[in-house]
Amino acid sequence: MREVEATLPSFCRQFFRGVQEYTSSRTRLAYAYDLRVFFEFLHSQNSVCSGMKITEFPLSVLDRITREDIEEYLDYITYYVKDGKEYSNNERGKKRKLSALKSFYNYYFRSELIKTNPAALVPIPKQHEKQIIRLDVDEVAILLDQVEEGEKLTKSQLKYHNKTKLRDVALLTLLLGTGIRVS
């Protein structure tokens, strides 16, 4: 955490101390990585911050960031190249990075250290549901037949299969018949 924190503006330490009581260390680390990407974006893409080192950004820079800047950031993180390596974020990644930014801005806004909170004006991107992939009736029958018969198994595998065949068929029948998810 300290290594990542050292690459951020000094005022970020106050944020991490402030949220320490109600966030896990993993959450704070994820925030740090996400904020680093945001500040790198500001440094390379935003004229307000381009002349300064990231570690030298003053807190007042947060008041000069607009809603449009944050929307440009979300567009930027869809696909970007850093140090010759390509990075991309799907809807879920963008949502997480925006949530980190909202928490960051909310902390300073509630502490009355900044006057504006442009992150609050940016709607969280909608996350589309993943399509459920289902087996058709023939595929279910083939799967159950394979479990019952245990074809193409070695002697030791066949010995183990004979002991667990009824259990395996029962479990698969339960999962396939009720739609219980294994996750």
Please state what every model-predicted region is:
Residues 1-183:
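Conserved catalytic core of the tyrosine transesterase superfamily
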